[in-house]
Amino acid sequence: MGRTISVGAAQMGPIGRHDPRKVVLKRLMELMKEAKSFNCDIVAFPELTLTTFFPRWAIEDEGELDGYYETQMPGPETLPLFECAAELGIGFTLGYAELIVRPARNARTQLRPRAARRVYRGQGG
C-alpha cells in the first residue's frame, strides 16, 4: 500500500513591483510554517513565486528586468527558504523565472523533506 502525504497549496496574495525580496521570502517562510502546523509534508507555491507577475509591464531597462530572474537556485537571497524547509522537515515546490541564455525556459524547483532537490524546466514558447 502506498503512503499518504499531505500537500498544502500556498495562496501568496499580491507581490508588488517594488516589494523587496526579503519581504517576499519572509511571507514564504511564514506560509511554510503555517503549512507545517497543519501537518503538511509538502507546500506548493505558485509560478513566479518570488516576484510580481512582471510580464504585465513593458520594461525596457534590462537591469530592472534581469532583477526578476534567478541565476541560481538556491542563491544567496533564497537560501534561507531552503534552510527553513530543512529545519521544519517539509518539502516545497515553487515556480520561478530563470535567467539563462536562449532558448528560454520556465523552471520549477522541488525540495523534498530529506533535502533531495530537483529542478524541472519547460521549454518557453
Give the location of each predicted region.
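Hydrophobic structural segments
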Residues: 1-125
